[in-house]
Amino acid sequence: MHTLIMVLLILDCIALVTVVLLQEGKSNGLSGAISGGAEQLFGKQKQRGIDLFLHRLTIVLSVIFFLLMLGISYFGL
């Protein structure tokens, strides 16, 4: 049981890091910090296609990570 949960946790961590790195950045870097990012406030686009899929997959993988960590702490593994 311990080995299974640990393997699932490692796979989930690798998948979560990969999905987060595949997502497109939402900031303009330093220029966005200086200008205050006002153009993003009024020109916000809805996520579509692969961006929406990656966003939802990040949420699912995060919930799985949270549940696996609760399981590890509950069972004292």
From Swiss-Prot:
InterPro entries assigned: SecG
GO cellular component terms given for this protein: plasma membrane
Statement: the UniProt record of this protein carries the keyword Cytoplasm: no
Superkingdom of origin organism: Bacteria
Pfam families: SecG (PF03840)
Record key words, sorted: Cell membrane, Membrane, Protein transport, Translocation, Transmembrane, Transmembrane helix, Transport
Topology in membrane: Multi-pass membrane protein
Keyword ATP-binding: no
Compartments in which it is found: Cell membrane
Transmembrane segments: 2-22, 57-77
Job description of the protein: Involved in protein export. Participates in an early event of protein translocation.
Family: Belongs to the SecG family.
Protein name: Probable protein-export membrane protein SecG
The species this protein was found in: Staphylococcus saprophyticus subsp. saprophyticus (strain ATCC 15305 / DSM 20229 / NCIMB 8711 / NCTC 7292 / S-41)
Primary gene name: secG
